């Protein structure tokens, strides 16, 4: 009986550790996905003003 309790306790402990590691890995993957979206938004924010200035400069040159 004691060895069976010991085995069940060991399985429970190992299962808890496994679930904890899976949760950490899942959180890390979600953070990577979030970072990618934030990076794309930052690039868009940087690109749009530069593109606007470039187009206005080109239209000024072509209009002369």
From Swiss-Prot:
Listed GO biological process terms: defense response to bacterium; defense response to fungus; innate immune response; killing of cells of another organism
Coiled-coil regions listed in the entry: none
Superkingdom, natural source: Eukaryota
Main location: secreted
Tissue expression profile of the protein: Expressed by the skin glands.
Keyword terms: Amidation, Amphibian defense peptide, Antibiotic, Antimicrobial, Cleavage on pair of basic residues, Fungicide, Immunity, Innate immunity, Secreted, Signal
Signal peptide: 1-22
Protein's cellular compartments: Secreted
Modified residues (Leucine amide): 62
GO cellular component, one term: extracellular region
Propeptide residue interval(s): 23-46
Function statement: Antimicrobial peptide with activity against Gram-positive and Gram-negative bacteria and against fungi. Has been tested against S.aureus (MIC=1.25 ug/mL), B.pumilus (MIC=2.5 ug/mL), B.cereus (MIC=15.0 ug/mL), E.coli (MIC=1.25 ug/mL), B.dysenteriae (MIC=5.0 ug/mL), A.cacoaceticus (MIC=15.0 ug/mL), P.aeruginosa (MIC=5.0 ug/mL) and C.albicans (MIC=1.25 ug/mL). Also shows a weak hemolytic activity.
Family: Belongs to the frog skin active peptide (FSAP) family. Temporin subfamily.
Protein name: Temporin-ALd
Species whose genome carries this gene: Amolops loloensis (Lolokou Sucker Frog)
